[in-house]
Amino acid sequence: MTIHYPNGQQPVQHYNTHNELPTPHQSIYAKRGMSLEDEINHSNQYYLARHIAVIHKKPTPIQLVKVDYPKRSAAVIKEAYFRRPSTTDYNGVYRGYYIDFDAKETRNKNSFPLKNFHPHQIQHMRECVAQGGICFAFIKFTELDLLYLLPASNLFKYWDQQQNGGRKSILRTDIAKEGYQIHYQLNPRLPYLNAVDKIIAAKA
């Protein structure tokens, strides 16, 4: 099936083969091949199953262009287009707070390029924060296997500096200083709600 983004680019497809929660005897090392998206989905399943939080990946509406019907009981989508650019990757509810965040990866070792975000994503997060929501970004340095949660307020600061002629990237040292490092564990894979608890405490 061919799916087109609004800007004409082809999408990068991710396949989640980890639909079940891990049992205690499973090794963390067995999951090193998981994508960041899979790791987040896996963690969200853990939180949902234990009634801790309800957070899901956002579906993106598509417009069907070509559909084949090889059988009466089955339809095969041959071509489709995303109707509009996506905002952020995930949203949900935790402790009565609206949660909204995006997940980004970079192969750079020392900085994260701000071009990985789009203006409409930043604007969406600003609007959510203005309504009392909690927004942040997962930023993973894949070559170093380091993952951070950066609160939206810090992301906005660097975004605005870039717009005013500042750096076009965020130094990893600054992300480590202003964000929260997420350490991998067995269950949940990414215990990121611990960092969200700190963001909530700072709001009080």
Curated annotation (Swiss-Prot):
EC id: 3.1.21.10
Keywords (A to Z) from UniProt: Cytoplasm, DNA damage, DNA recombination, DNA repair, Endonuclease, Hydrolase, Magnesium, Metal-binding, Nuclease
Keyword hit for Oxidoreductase: no
GO-annotated biological processes: chromosome segregation; DNA recombination; DNA repair
GO cellular component terms given for this protein: cytoplasm
Entry's cofactor comment: Binds 1 Mg(2+) ion per subunit.
Residues flagged as site, Transition state stabilizer: 104
Catalytic reaction annotation: Endonucleolytic cleavage at a junction such as a reciprocal single-stranded crossover between two homologous DNA duplexes (Holliday junction)
UniProt cofactor(s): Mg(2+)
Any GO molecular function: magnesium ion binding
Residues that, per the record, bind Mg(2+): 87, 89, 102, 121
Pfam families: RecU
Region described as Disordered: 1-24
Localization of this protein: Cytoplasm
Family matches, as InterPro entries: Resolv_RecU, Restrct_endonuc-II-like, tRNA_endonuc-like_dom_sf
Record-stated family: Belongs to the RecU family.
Job of this protein: Endonuclease that resolves Holliday junction intermediates in genetic recombination. Cleaves mobile four-strand junctions by introducing symmetrical nicks in paired strands. Promotes annealing of linear ssDNA with homologous dsDNA. Required for DNA repair, homologous recombination and chromosome segregation.
Name under which the protein is recorded: Holliday junction resolvase RecU
Organism per entry: Limosilactobacillus reuteri (strain DSM 20016) (Lactobacillus reuteri)
